[in-house]
Amino acid sequence: MKLPRLRTILLTPLVLIALLYLAGVIMVARIDRTVGPLKGEPAGHRTVAIFGASGTAGDGILKAALADPHVDTVHVITRRETPRIREGVDSGKVVMTTHMDYLDYAAIREQLAGVDAVYWAIGISSVGVDEETYGLIHVDFPMAFVEQWVPVSAKDNISFHYISSSDISEDSSAMWVREKVRAENSLFGFADGTKMKVIAYRPDYIGPTQEEAHLGQRALYGFFRPLGAAVKATEIGQAMLEVTARGDEFASGDKLGTFSIVRYAGAYELRQSSTSPSQ
């Protein structure tokens, strides 16, 4: 086989992939991501709690909450401290509680009674993990929490924001998908008829915060973001804060995919840039 022909054979798939990638980028760029302005005053979210703040998504949520002038207190429930958590504690905005048993919350019920919204980011990869352990962490942990939080809450309306996963379906044969679906259905079902609403967030690839990201993660984020298949961890936090502030615009059982997360994070940034803490 002659060299020019071999080169053509090798390059053709690469060119096709590049063209498909470019087409995807163009399609995503044309999507309208604007969100209407917040109607009325923001719903109360002066006091929030974050579970999983030591992980990738949780670190971004905490970073967003620390930067929000409308959030007075952030309860961080964690097994270990991180530089971000320490920064929050030193600022006086974060109350850190070391907690080891995520099936029993009796020791922290009093401090959680005054929480307006909970941002739940506890999770692990399914690689090398059996179904029982994965279900314990992704289903049993959050269910145990909401079952114990709702009865002691002193607030009239509370919200629970759960990080799920993109493209999940009850028809899937994958273990981790089944468990994510079970988690959503269990949380939505429990919230029905209570003063708590549950919102699920279904991001694709989550890019770590600038301080935590390594070269490989930056490369993956840079590849997937133009395709609309990546979101920054801080954007998840901003979207959660915006959804919380919009109150009745969202109902229990609502789900936000990557595009919606990015849209509401953008709406959050726009609102913050045009208002002051006193407004």
What are these regions (language model features)?
Residues 36-70:
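N-terminal Rossmann NAD(P)H-binding glycine-rich loop of SDR-like oxidoreductase domains
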Residues 72, 185-210:
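Conserved beta-loop-beta element that borders a ligand/cofactor-binding pocket
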Residues 1-41:
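N-terminal membrane-anchoring alpha-helices
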Residues 74, 139-145, 179-187, 233-236:
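Conserved catalytic Lys-bearing alpha helix of Rossmann-like short-chain dehydrogenase/reductases
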Residues 48, 90-144:
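NAD(P)H-binding glycine-rich loop region in Rossmannoid oxidoreductase-like domains
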Residues 225-253:
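C-terminal helical subdomain
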Residues 47, 124, 132-136, 140-181, ...:
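Conserved Rossmann-fold NAD(P)-dependent oxidoreductase catalytic core, especially the SDR/UDP-sugar
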